[in-house]
């Protein structure tokens, strides 16, 4: 069987790979399709396996899903990288990430990341405490108080249409009306949402959570929602930072949280065409893990890789840090299947490019759950690179670093990833450096610092650092590396070591945990991003950081805010810029309002300086007030027209974008 599958150009991964069935053919809405295919049989000798799941397979998956709802299944789900139904047994209910991972003060008084999941776990950070005290005015003796656990009596009651519930039970699709399940899916990870979880509660949350296990289940759910005029809000990994998952407070209909996490399989891999067909609920880390077993990868690595899903990537037009080699999500997607109130949207073939009018994929990508549910996607894959190497470059200042990145982009020789940190972000990263166990290593670090600051004359309070990641064929990587370092030298850049580069990337997946620690000590913090033409990058970065400082001072913030940025993606015509800002809110009566007003002012400054509304976080409800201005009245009207046709009764009523 395996040899036959390989000969056909498709290799199913795991026991769940499907090749279709008679039931699939009987359900085919186009009975002439088989005849047409027979007439062009010669063109399909190397065709891909059928993607559809049979009715029996859907039933089997529902049964298996029900079995894994028990707490005993949680450790297996945790290890595999899939998201269990009871997310709260693995993940924090009021913060980022896994329950076993958080920053604490250890017995030595040093900040340490608990657990064993990350390279930084279990290591003391000897200078981080001093950094947060000096930078943010934190007094570690004064902690905030927050709810220790979720009290079901504090949550809005579940209001569900009884006729709908009766019909739902007939489908055998798993569901829950429990308070903790509903609250867990009522939010993403904006500061506002996490603050509310710690200090209060949402005004509106989903009334019921549904767990489809395949495309056909989603069709049934959408049909029932249309029948009873209910509201559906899809959720994948729950990593939204745009209020995309928050329920509209004035929604009076039953709100369904359609959780795609149990739709988490790779349906097939086509090794001839280097594509994989996957269900939308598979997480990035699980997708990469399974593909790697067969020697492949997608190369798509957003910072939320651990928890975000393929469906979420498509619906928000996501970007990954290695897009210079593999592309953004719009470059990776070959085929999308989406269930809408009008029916199923998908193309009739999986050709690499078509000239068939406006690309319907671009109606789906970035739709943010407003038109339907993405159930499956075909994405490009590549062989796992044979060689990977990190690097870093120190520049005298941020401006020269930007000029270097611009030249690298112009020559189209950017490594898989290149990130340029401003001075404050460099110092922040340096404060997260773990304790050095070797005197020799400590001596070398001191020697490098002396060389850069004293011998080369770099000002420690001005220098900027770029981290680099190269991957591919070893010989080509080494040639590529030399080319990049030669360009950097022309802009005053000095090689700063492979270890510094590697550490910068290893911090990627733990940065989000720091906000939870900050909240315990009266600090509010957030990240946001934009993209801008090259000639606007330096001014935009400076003006946004100055605006944040000015806004905080005018609003009575007693300690100067932490405001920093990095250039995190490069393009021919511009770059993506990522900002962090945080402030100590002790003495402020309404810190959340101050924070939101400051963040909005920063966004206004971005737009005034020629930046985009968003590069990859999306619009959601957080940024939709600026969407019409960003895409024009006519463009906004086009989006509304699509919404009104595809979803005339606003079944997908999360109210993102419009």
Curated annotation (Swiss-Prot):
Entry-annotated residues carrying N6-acetyllysine: 102, 347
Domain FAD-binding PCMH-type: 202-384
Modified residues (Phosphoserine): 65
Disease field: Rhizomelic chondrodysplasia punctata 3: A form of rhizomelic chondrodysplasia punctata, a disease characterized by severely disturbed endochondral bone formation, rhizomelic shortening of femur and humerus, vertebral disorders, dwarfism, cataract, cutaneous lesions, facial dysmorphism, and severe intellectual disability with spasticity.
EC code(s) of this entry: 2.5.1.26
Enzyme class, broadest EC rank: transferase
Alphabetized Pfam families for the sequence: FAD-oxidase_C, FAD_binding_4
Positions of the UniProt region annotated as Important for enzyme activity: 615-617, 654-658
Catalytic activity as recorded in UniProt: a long chain fatty alcohol + a 1-acylglycerone 3-phosphate = a 1-O-alkylglycerone 3-phosphate + a long-chain fatty acid + H(+); hexadecan-1-ol + 1-hexadecanoylglycerone 3-phosphate = 1-O-hexadecylglycerone 3-phosphate + hexadecanoate + H(+); 1-hexadecanoylglycerone 3-phosphate + a long-chain fatty acid = a 1-acylglycerone 3-phosphate + hexadecanoate
Top-level division of the source organism's lineage: Eukaryota
Biased composition (Basic and acidic residues): 23-35
Source species taxonomy: Eukaryota, Metazoa, Chordata, Craniata, Vertebrata
First and last residues of the transit peptide: 1-58
InterPro entries, alphabetized: Alkyl-DHAP_Synthase, FAD-bd_oxidored_4_C, FAD-bd_PCMH, FAD-bd_PCMH-like_sf, FAD-bd_PCMH_sub1, FAD-bd_PCMH_sub2, FAD-linked_Oxase-like_C, Oxid_FAD_bind_N
Sequence positions that bind FAD: 234-240, 303-309, 316-319, 368-374
Similarity comment: Belongs to the FAD-binding oxidoreductase/transferase type 4 family.
Main location, first listed in the record: membrane
Key words of the record: Acetylation, Cataract, Disease variant, Dwarfism, FAD, Flavoprotein, Lipid biosynthesis, Lipid metabolism, Membrane, Peroxisome, Phosphoprotein, Rhizomelic chondrodysplasia punctata, Transferase, Transit peptide
Cited PROSITE patterns: FAD_PCMH
The protein, known as: Alkyldihydroxyacetonephosphate synthase, peroxisomal
Region (Disordered): 1-41, 63-86
Cofactor(s) needed by this chain: FAD
Residues the record lists as Phosphothreonine modifications: 74
Site annotation Important for enzyme activity: residues: 419
Compositional bias ranges of the Low complexity kind: 63-77
Organism the protein comes from: Homo sapiens
Cellular localisation: Peroxisome membrane; Peroxisome
Active site location: 578
């Amino acid at each position: 069987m395996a040899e036959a599958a390989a000969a056909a150009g498709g290799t199913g991964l795991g026991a769940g790979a499907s090749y279709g069935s008679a039931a699939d053919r009987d359900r085919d809405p186009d009975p002439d399709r088989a005849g047409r295919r027979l007439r062009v049989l010669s063109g399909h000798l190397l065709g891909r396996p059928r993607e559809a799941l049979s009715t029996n397979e859907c039933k089997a998956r529902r049964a298996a899903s029900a079995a894994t709802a028990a707490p005993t299944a949680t450790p297996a789900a945790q290890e595999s990288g899939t998201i269990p139904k009871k997310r709260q047994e693995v993940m924090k209910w009021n913060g980022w990430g896994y329950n076993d991972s958080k920053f604490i003060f250890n017995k030595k008084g040093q900040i340490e990341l608990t657990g064993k999941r990350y390279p930084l776990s279990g290591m003391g950070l000897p200078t981080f405490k001093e950094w947060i005290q000096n930078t943010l005015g934190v007094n570690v003796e004064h902690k905030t108080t927050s709810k220790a656990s979720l009290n079901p009596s504090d949550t809005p009651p579940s209001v569900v249409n009884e006729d709908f519930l009766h019909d739902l039970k007939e489908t055998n699709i798993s569901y829950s009306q429990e308070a903790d399940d509903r609250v867990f899916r009522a939010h993403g990870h904006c500061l506002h949402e996490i603050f509310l979880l710690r200090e209060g509660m949402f005004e509106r949350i989903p009334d019921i959570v549904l767990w489809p296990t395949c495309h056909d289940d989603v069709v049934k759910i959408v049909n029932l929602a249309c029948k009873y005029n209910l509201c559906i809000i899809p959720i994948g990994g729950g990593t939204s930072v745009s209020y995309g998952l928050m329920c509209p407070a004035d929604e009076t209909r039953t709100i369904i949280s359609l959780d795609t996490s149990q739709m988490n399989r790779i349906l097939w891999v086509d090794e001839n065409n280097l594509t994989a067909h996957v269900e939308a609920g598979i997480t990035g880390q699980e997708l990469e893990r399974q593909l790697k077993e067969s020697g492949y990868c997608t190369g798509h690595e957003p910072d939320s890789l651990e928890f975000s899903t393929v469906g979420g990537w498509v619906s928000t037009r996501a970007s990954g840090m290695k897009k210079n080699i593999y592309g953004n999500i719009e470059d990776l997607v070959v085929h999308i299947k989406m269930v809408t109130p009008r029916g199923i949207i998908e193309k009739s073939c999986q050709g690499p490019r078509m000239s068939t009018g406006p690309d319907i994929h671009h109606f789906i990508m970035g739709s943010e759950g407003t038109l339907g549910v993405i159930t499956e996607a075909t994405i490009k894959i590549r062989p796992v690179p044979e060689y990977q190497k990190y690097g870093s470059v120190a520049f005298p200042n941020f401006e020269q670093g930007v000029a270097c990145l611009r030249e690298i982009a112009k020559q189209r020789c950017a490594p898989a990833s290149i990130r340029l940190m401003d001075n404050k972000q460099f110092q922040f990263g340096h404060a997260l450096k773990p304790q050095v166990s070797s005197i020799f290593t400590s001596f070398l670090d001191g020697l490098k610092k002396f060389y850069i600051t004293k011998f080369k004359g770099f000002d420690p309070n001005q220098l900027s650092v770029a981290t680099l990641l190269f991957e591919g064929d070893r010989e080509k990587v080494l040639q590529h590396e030399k080319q990049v370092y030669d360009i950097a030298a022309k802009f005053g850049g000095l090689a700063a070591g492979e270890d510094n580069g590697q550490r910068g990337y290893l911090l990627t997946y733990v940065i989000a945990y720091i906000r939870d620690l900050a909240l315990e000590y009266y600090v509010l913090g957030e990240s946001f991003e934009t993209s801008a033409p090259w000639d606007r990058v330096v001014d935009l970065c400076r003006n946004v950081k100055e605006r944040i400082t000015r806004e905080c001072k005018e609003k009575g913030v007693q300690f100067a805010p932490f405001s920093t940025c990095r250039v995190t993606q490069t393009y021919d015509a511009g770059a993506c810029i990522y900002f962090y800002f945080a402030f100590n809110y002790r003495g402020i009566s309404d810190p959340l309002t101050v924070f939101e007003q400051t963040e909005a002012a920063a966004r206004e400054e971005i737009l005034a300086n020629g930046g985009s509304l968003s590069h990859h976080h999306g619009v959601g409800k957080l940024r939709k007030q600026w969407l019409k201005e960003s895409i024009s009245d006519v463009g906004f009207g086009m989006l509304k027209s699509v919404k009104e046709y595809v979803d005339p009764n606003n079944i997908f009523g999360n109210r993102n974008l419009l």
